[in-house]
Regions:
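A short acidic, Gly/Pro-enriched loop at the edge of an enzyme's catalytic core
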Residues: 121-131
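N-terminal, positively charged/glycine-rich alpha-helical extensions of SAM-dependent methyltransferases
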Residues: 1-36
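A short SAM/SAH-binding and catalytic strip from SAM-dependent methyltransferases
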Residues: 130-143
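C-terminal alpha-helical "lid/dimerization" subdomain adjacent to the S-adenosyl-L-methionine
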Residues: 163-206, 210-220
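A short glycine-rich, Lys/Arg-flanked "PGG" loop and its adjoining helix->strand segment in the class I
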Residues: 146-158
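Class I SAM-dependent methyltransferase SAM/SAH-binding core
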Residues: 67-121
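Conserved alpha-helix/loop element of class I SAM-dependent methyltransferases that forms part
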Residues: 43-62, 75, 79
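Helix-to-beta-strand junctions that scaffold the AdoMet/dcAdoMet cofactor pocket
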Residues: 61, 85, 140-141, 156-158
Length: 229
């Protein structure tokens, strides 16, 4: 992945720039200082953070070339690096300079990772064995989500996988269902639309096989799209 020059830097999307919640959570100067801690991630994900990271990393094999769109708080990148081993490579992109700088500090000294400014909608075609998209889709508007999914599907080689770990509609009996619906309406305005979004429907060309597993009473999903050889 080539270095991003100042002239090539992607603009910060309007949905990020205009949202007070997103500006505070991701774009603030001190956002990582307050939020980039394992206990914070576990609290936000109701104790399921490490489990979901392991489930995503389980889809990656040693020596593979992996793209991670969005920097992600917590130890997710380390899970992927552990899965690919010394012979693999991890590319990470994010549209926010502060997030890029923070992850570079966290992973300083790792030789097989590149972290650059970039938009998940603009990635190279068929360049990766795996794309691992961890809790990004619920944070973007539906039109942007469709564009991101299309780009990420296009980024894997024949036989490659795109792994989406994100929110899912919880079972009707889930005690946290009403609370999460309220949180998504008030703090994460694009998340609710993901509850009823079958990601396989975004595979317009039908070039992928799909499987979905849900966890924690259906609140979370891992959906894996595999490009046909």
């Amino acid at each position: 992945m080539s270095q991003t020059s100042l002239s090539e830097r992607p603009p910060v999307p309007a949905y990020l720039a205009e949202s007070r919640t997103y500006r505070w959570a991701y774009g603030g100067r001190f956002s990582p200082f307050f939020l980039d801690h394992a206990w914070v991630v576990e609290a936000i994900l109701w104790g399921q953070g490490r489990r979901l990271m392991r489930l995503a990393a389980a889809e990656v094999a040693p020596g593979e070339i992996v793209l991670q769109p969005a920097c992600v708080y917590g130890a997710f990148s380390r899970h992927l690096l552990g899965a690919i081993g010394a012979e693999g490579r991890l590319d990470v992109i994010d549209v926010l300079p502060g997030q890029v700088d923070n992850l570079r500090r966290k992973l300083a000294g790792r030789a097989n990772v590149q972290i650059e400014l970039g938009d998940a909608e603009d990635v190279p075609a068929q360049a990766y064995d795996v794309v691992s998209c961890f809790f990004l889709l619920h944070e973007v508007p539906q039109a942007k989500r469709r564009a991101i999914v299309a780009a990420l599907l296009g980024a894997v080689r024949p036989g490659g996988r795109v792994v989406f770990v994100d929110y899912h509609r919880p079972r009707w009996w889930h005690p946290l269902g009403p609370l999460m619906a309220l949180v998504h309406r008030t703090l994460e305005p694009f998340a609710a639309s993901l509850w009823d979004q079958r990601l396989a429907e975004l595979d317009a060309a039908g070039e992928f096989s799909w499987r979905t597993e849900t966890y924690f009473g259906g609140l979370y999903q891992k959906t894996v799209a595999t490009r046909q050889d």
